[in-house]
Amino acid sequence: MNITLILFLIGILGFVLNRKNIILMLISIEIMLLAITFLILVSSLNMDDIIGQTYAIYIIVVAGAESAIGLAILVAFYRLINSPVKNPRSNYSGDPAPPSGGRGPYLHFNLLPVVSSCNLIQSRNYSSVLHRKIPTHTSCVWAGLNPSFITGFSDAEGSFVVTILKNPRYKIGWNVQARFQIKLNEKDRALLLLIQNYFDNIGYISKINDRSTVEFRVSDITSLNNIIIPHFEKYQLITNKYGDLVIFKQIVSLMLENKHTTLEGLKEILEHRASLNWGLSKTLKESFPSIIPVKRVKIENNILSNLSSLPLLPGGGNWVAGFSSGEANFFITMSGTKVWLRFSIAQDSRDILLLKSLVKFFNCGYIAQYKNRKVCEFIVTKINDIIIYIIPFFDQYKIEGSKYNDYVKFKEAAILIKNKEHLTEKGLNKIIELKNSLPPPASLEGGMNKNI
């Protein structure tokens, strides 16, 4: 009886003193149950009732088994939540294409949104990355995104931003912040989580909001210098965003030297900021009228912009898949019973060299230039080109994100047209259904000049 009482008291004390540790609390409860079971057994053994003794033994066997299983589960769970997450990039060793006609090891998150090997945490992560450098290994052998895909997607949707705002709390009256960001529709949150995971979970993913937007942002200066910039130096940008990266890197270097904390250093940063994106704001121009912008690197000086380089570029297929996941459009248009398909990528006219390179890359299509807008567009409309070149490419190098569903419907319509099923009522109705489920074509106002 004394042993039973001691066990019971130990269980109670353990429960009370360890309320913040669920593991120890549950162990304490198991000890109390063991004490009660032992009490029943001792009491029944002092009786001549064979039924009571049998019942007591039964209770001990069941309770013991339950306790053992419960503790085993708890220990396994405890080890799981405390085990380190393997860096998903640690197995990269090259940038090969996935197997022809197949998905290969790359994750198709539209079909499998939960990535067991990724630490997908929708919160800020400001862990120190002072000594972390971007790995040199690059072959995607885990359920993640190819490095060249990430660069292509960043060429489409990423931004290198430097904000300079008045703030009296700072010594010089101005606050400087540099950041890399990708902003998308909420439906592409899963894709941003994969991108964040590739970058060692630095930065943060914004919470769900009423604007239906989601943003991946990295503003920690050390993370930018040690992880973001080295990635884009190894897997280079191809659009005019390459020029933004060059200036952005220079500004980050100045900030690492604490130049942003002095007025002279701020002016030096402003000279670079004036050539980044859309230049200086009206407030900055009025406050610093003597700023002379540094010369922006010309994209023609980037060897990747050569018209013949894209097909030869290592990882070029993955870059195009990433870029298309951000910028491509898959359209179905109809007039009565006539059906047309259109695959297109529109860009600022500054990137016309890139679009001309896509014509060579896909071996089809043409470039459209618009008179009233500084926009040019790579367009493929011939059904044979779509069947022979476009669909096989995207079957091998997958579109990621919500745009994948557009591609699947586009492909289904193309197959129906190829097989002449659009000439039947059933086939035409199916194409109408597919068309109505796709986003409407964007209107590019103004006249068009067609260049082959």
Curated annotation (Swiss-Prot):
Gene3D superfamilies per UniProt: 1.10.287.3510, Homing endonucleases (3.10.28.10)
One of the protein's GO biological processes: ATP synthesis coupled electron transport
Keywords: Endonuclease, Hydrolase, Intron homing, Membrane, Mitochondrion, Nuclease, Transmembrane, Transmembrane helix
Enzyme's top EC category: hydrolase
Molecular function, one GO term: oxidoreductase activity, acting on NAD(P)H
TM spans (from-to): 1-21, 22-42, 57-77
The organism's place on the tree of life at top rank: Eukaryota
Pfam families noted in UniProt: LAGLIDADG_1 (PF00961), Oxidored_q2 (PF00420)
Compartments in which it is found: Mitochondrion membrane
Region (ndh-4L intron 1 encoded): 81-452
Main location: mitochondrion
GO cellular component, one term: respiratory chain complex I
The protein's Enzyme Commission number: 3.1.-.-
Region described as ndh-4L exon 1 encoded: spans on this chain: 1-80
Mode of membrane association: Multi-pass membrane protein
Family: In the N-terminal section; belongs to the complex I subunit 4L family.
Comment field (misc): Encoded from partially processed ndh-4L mRNA that terminates with the in-frame coding sequence of the first intron.
Function of the protein: Mitochondrial DNA endonuclease involved in intron homing.
Name used for this protein in its record: Probable intron-encoded endonuclease 2
Native source species: Neurospora crassa (strain ATCC 24698 / 74-OR23-1A / CBS 708.71 / DSM 1257 / FGSC 987)
